[in-house]
Amino acid sequence: MIPRVLILLTLVALFCACSTLAAVAHIEVDCIPPFTVYLLYGFVTLILICSLVTVVIAFIQFIDWICVRIAYLRHHPQYRDRTIADLLRIL
């Protein structure tokens, strides 16, 4: 079972990126002063970079979770501890 936090974190980041791009797509730049347009596009770039970094971090956490699960399951059954498995949400 994949931890729900990783899925939620990825979905929130993708939602932020998509909603930001959708909001910017409907802006008429002819009606706004140049400084405001540059400021707006700066914020859009910042939001997209933060969303991308969040998705990358969530992906790295997912890979780490898989590696921990594989390493735990490779141990001999007599050394497996059920409380640690519950803590790591492995089984």
Curated annotation (Swiss-Prot):
Transmembrane segments: 35-60
Acetylation keyword on record: no
Coiled coil start-end: none
Main location: host cell
The keyword RNA-binding belongs to this UniProt entry's keyword annotation: no
Signal peptide: 1-22
Membrane topology classification: Single-pass type I membrane protein
InterPro entries according to UniProt: Adeno_E3B
GO CC entries: host cell endoplasmic reticulum membrane; membrane
Side Cytoplasmic, residues: 61-91
Keywords of the record: Early protein, Host endoplasmic reticulum, Host membrane, Membrane, Signal, Transmembrane, Transmembrane helix
Disulfide partners: none
Annotated localization: Host endoplasmic reticulum membrane
Residues in compartment: Lumenal: 23-34
Alphabetized Pfam families for the sequence: Adeno_E3B
Role this protein plays: Down-regulates the EGF receptor.
Protein family (similarity comment): Belongs to the adenoviridae E3B family.
Record-given protein name: Early E3B 10.4 kDa protein
